[in-house]
Swiss-Prot record:
Name of the molecule in the record: Hexon protein
Subcellular location(s) of the protein: Virion; Host nucleus
Record GO terms (molecular function): structural molecule activity
Subunit: Homotrimer. Interacts with the capsid vertex protein; this interaction binds the peripentonal hexons to the neighboring penton base. Interacts with the hexon-linking protein; this interaction tethers the hexons surrounding the penton to those situated in the central plate of the facet. Interacts with the hexon-interlacing protein; this interaction lashes the hexons together. Interacts with host dyneins DYNC1LI1 and DYNC1I2; this interaction might be involved in intracellular microtubule-dependent transport of incoming viral capsid.
GO aspect biological process, one term: microtubule-dependent intracellular transport of viral material towards nucleus
């Protein structure tokens, strides 16, 4: 193959958008058109076709798929390495786009896996309601708290209906009418109860495994305890408890109100309150992100012809294989449609959780609940009759039941709508608050490792931070939640789907199909010859699995075992002469296959220390021809693994990885960015609203009215984003075409917000009441946390200040925006090298054929944890594949202007 220096000079052009993917010679295009009647050569997701009925190469050519068994497998501690030998026979062409790795194995998702909200056990029980039980009193005394519903006469031998006390009387049986025990005498009754030696736990969430096929749960002898009503003068038993010890467990709940150890077995232990464990879906990442190991340190994949042994795969640490694949799919198809074969279910979040549209609750009509009898309270009465001018007792044909209720029917009121909204806010927002806004309840010991599921479960959010009255009437995201990853949430529908594909149990077997994503070979037409194909697969559960809570799955007991990896591939169903013609054409270097990486960008990560607001970066001098611009965002350091290692010991996190899956959510933290070349040229000139060399993203104080769309984004930045994403701007604003306005686009994710706050400077009587002293719903809610037992008494609320009505306080307007998923973009092109003052007289040229250094300064909002500036330098990234002879494959990677491995060299 000719060396790059012998090839014709590449001509650079400005490519609008990222749609240019493959460049084919005119001859190859003509060939594709000639064969398009039965096969679409240029379509990656190829349509199914029927193979020719005659004149085919061999019977294998007509098979839909072939299985390749590995010739070498190496199951290491951190990776599973596998090697295949691809034999492509004469007059056949292997379609690399059809290949996938077929992987089987077993998965232990660990004890932190909980694929549902709430509890599966006694979910209807009150949170602090007790089981039927005996409990300790003073000294050796035993106390009793129980319900006895099973009616039947009691003798010294127990109840006659109870023939096997290992499971009878069963706790789910009792009278079926409200009449029994109210109007009609229930008589003697029995039930089951836990012995005092069984630990105290609330009924909500409690479970004991059966010990016999009839459902009995006793782990030892069942003992009878007899009781009589204290007011009865006879010496007969009225109630009977069959007491037993059971193996009491709480599979999916924990205590949020716990008494001290010396009170657990006493009466105070009956009032402990349970809460469900937090839901935690665990599944493979979208499109199996992180499973295949892309690396440049010797563990990278190999595709080499056995004749030449030249590896066609040259991966770089600054290449964006996973992110590029995500954005490519978004350009091709609707990402909101899930597809199980490739585990394709994009990470998402509930819009109502990220931005709370708090329009109050529609509780104009009160909600009542009534007693089962439908009347009451009932009073025992005596029948009377008239005797002359007086009354006397009527004993004629009068039965023993004479009950009458005075006044209206007894009822209790509950505000269902307010409770539902309050519960929604607690489960979906408050529980996901940063840890600094949570506390550990008394008598509960939290684990030292904050990345564990057990730690996340016991921490409770403080009251009044997220509630129905906070920002009421506004569409606003809680400020403290803006920098919390919204994709690490149980309402991430894509993750929930991927978790459910594996089933609902902790232990599961999996059988998955993993596509090849590397841009240089995922569309390759492999010509006849014998090739070595090798790849490594990670076994680090934090990298290959994703969880809702982002807990450290290594510590929490998850593990994976890969049992086998096979490769499936397809040959083109072509006749002899067609296949040989295609091969002959592709052997010619003028018909080399050229593939452009979809993202075509070199990425760099620059650390931003905690509480830092300015970050300068420098790029050494280079020729900027072919450069297309910058894309950038911000990601958290703890959510970003070291990709060069198969196992990053510092990556103690399993939530979404924005660096790989495009779940960006910190774009709103940028304030401005300046771009300076080492020349006198002001780039991009003063034809914009603001200062040359500087892009102002948002303004907190906007005296000149530069902000746009009821937010604090500047008009200039809005214009730049509309231009960069849609080429909309100078010709007036309009909505972009649907094929451009996809999941990751700017306009779809731009969310302006506005609210009013008390003007503390102009409201003389304003009192800054701290959260702990604010009360609203006192007596009906907890002062500590929503989940704690209610406390207090009814009283006028002291928070928040009214922003409406005749007593509305003075206010100021606050504005902001969010723009998740989207990469900020600044376009650049060799065509725009002369963007000085855009006049015929004053243009200064930033010559494209000379080298210039670049200095950029980013101003960002301070965050209290280390973050990373993620910059994509949009380059011209093309692989040109040449297969001159049988079993020989050569690839030239062209990467301008960053031809070396990363953007700093």
């Amino acid at each position: 193959m000719a060396t790059p220096s012998m090839l014709p000079q590449w001509s650079y052009m400005h490519i609008a958008g990222q749609d240019a993917a493959e460049y084919l010679s005119p001859a190859l295009v003509q060939f594709a058109q000639a064969t398009s009647s039965y096969f679409k050569l240029d379509n990656k997701f190829r349509n199914p076709t029927v193979a020719p009925t005659h004149d085919v190469t061999t019977e294998r050519s007509q098979r839909l798929q072939l299985r390749f068994v590995p010739v070498m497998q190496e199951d290491g501690q951190y990776t599973y390495k596998t090697r295949f030998q691809l034999a492509v026979g004469d007059n056949r062409v292997l379609d690399m786009a059809s290949t996938y790795f077929d992987i089987r194995g077993t998965l232990d998702r660990g004890p932190s896996f909980k694929p549902y909200s709430g509890t599966a056990y006694n979910a209807l029980a009150p949170r602090a309601g007790a089981n039927n039980c005996l409990f300790n009193g003073s000294g050796a005394n035993i106390n009793t708290l129980a319900q006895v519903p099973f009616a039947g006469a009691i003798t010294v031998n127990g109840q006659a209906a109870v023939t096997d006390n290992t499971y009878q009387p069963e706790p789910q049986l009792g009278p079926e009418s409200w009449v029994d025990g109210t109007l009609a005498d229930l008589g003697d009754a029995s039930g089951r109860a836990l012995k005092a030696s069984t630990p105290r736990m609330p009924c909500y969430g409690s479970y004991a495994p059966p010990t016999n096929e009839n459902g009995g749960q006793a782990t030892g002898a069942v003992e009878r305890r007899f009781y009589k009503v204290t007011t009865n003068n006879n010496n007969e038993a009225d109630a009977l408890l069959y007491t037993e010890d059971v193996n009491l467990q709480t599979p999916d709940t924990h205590l949020v109100h716990q008494v001290s150890d010396d009170q657990v077995t006493g009466v105070q232990g009956l009032g402990q309150q349970a809460a469900p464990n937090r839901p935690n879906y665990i599944g493979f990442r979208d499109n199996f992100i992180g499973l295949m190991y892309y690396n440049s340190n010797g563990n990278l994949g190999v595709l080499a012809g056995q004749s030449s042994q030249l590896n066609a795969v040259v991966d770089l640490q600054d290449r964006n294989t996973e992110l590029s694949y995500q954005l490519l799919l978004d350009a091709l198809t609707d990402r909101s449609r899930y597809f199980s074969m490739w585990n394709q279910a994009v990470d998402s979040y509930d819009q109502d959780v990220r931005i709370i549209d708090n329009h109050g609750v529609e509780d104009d009509m009160p909600n009542y609940c009534f007693p089962l009898s439908g009347m009451g309270p009932l009073t025992n009465m005596t029948a009377m009759k008239v005797n002359n001018q007086n009354f006397q007792t009527d004993n004629t044909n009068v039965g023993p039941i004479q009950k009458i209720g005075f006044g209206n029917v007894e009822a209790m009121e509950i505000n269902l709508n307010a409770n539902l909204f309050k519960g929604f806010l607690y489960s979906n927002v408050a529980l996901y608050l940063p840890d600094a806004y949570k506390y550990t309840p008394d008598n509960i010991v939290a684990p030292a490792n904050a990345n564990t599921y057990a730690y996340m479960n016991v921490r409770l959010p403080a009251a009044n931070l997220i509630d129905t009255f906070v920002n009421i009437g506004a569409r606003w995201s809680p400020d403290v939640m803006d920098s919390v990853n919204p994709f690490n949430h149980h309402r991430n529908a894509g993750l929930r789907y991927r978790s459910q594909l594996l089933g609902n149990g902790r232990y599961c077997s999996f059988h998955i199909q993993v596509p090849q994503k590397f841009f240089a070979i995922k569309n390759l037409l492999l010509l006849p010859g014998t090739y070595t194909y090798e790849w490594s697969f990670r076994k680090d559960v934090n990298m290959i699995l994703q969880s809702s809570l982002g807990n450290d799955l290594r510590v929490d007991g998850a593990s994976i075992n890969i049992q086998s990896i096979n490769l499936y591939a397809s040959f083109f169903p072509m006749a002899h002469n067609t296949a040989s013609t295609l091969e002959a054409m592709l052997r010619n270097d003028v018909n080399d296959q050229s593939f452009a990486d979809y993202l075509s960008a070199a990425n760099m990560l620059y650390p931003i220390p905690a509480n830092t607001t300015n970050l300068p970066i420098s790029i050494p001098a280079r020729n900027w021809a072919g450069f297309r611009g910058w894309s950038f965002t911000r990601i958290k350091q703890r959510e970003t693994p070291a990709l060069g290692s198969p196992y990053d010991p510092y990556f103690t996190y399993s939530g979404s990885i924005p660096y790989l899956d495009s779940t960006f959510y910190l774009s709103h933290t940028f304030r401005r960015v300046s771009i300076m070349f080492d020349s006198s040229v002001s780039w991009p000139g003063n034809d914009r609203l603001l200062t040359p060399n500087e892009f102002e993203i948002k303004r907190y104080v906007d005296g000149e009215g530069y902000n746009v769309a009821q937010s604090n984004m500047t008009k200039d930045w809005f214009l730049v984003q509309m231009l960069a994403h849609y080429n909309i701007g100078y010709q007036g604003y309009h909505l972009p075409e649907s094929y451009k306005d996809r999941m990751y686009s700017f306009l779809r994710n731009f969310e302006p917000m506005c609210r009013q706050l008390v003007d503390v400077t102009n409201y003389a009587t304003y009192q800054s009441v701290t959260v702990g002293h604010q009360h609203n719903n006192s007596g009906y809610a907890s002062a500590l946390s929503t989940f704690n037992p209610r406390e207090g008494h009814p009283y006028p609320a002291n928070w928040p200040y009214p922003l409406i009505g005749v007593n509305a306080v003075p206010t100021v307007t606050q504005k902001k925006f969010l723009c998740d998923r989207t990469l900020w973009r600044i376009p650049f092109s060799s065509n725009f090298m002369s963007m000085g003052t855009l006049t015929d007289l004053g243009q200064n040229l930033l010559y494209s054929n000379s080298a210039h250094a670049l200095d950029m300064t980013f101003e960002v909002d301070a965050m209290n944890e280390p973050t990373l500036l993620y910059v994509l330098f949009e380059v011209f990234d093309v692989a040109r594949v040449h297969q001159p002879h049988r079993g020989v494959i050569e690839v030239v990677y062209l990467r301008t202007p960053f031809s070396a491995g990363n953007a700093t060299t």
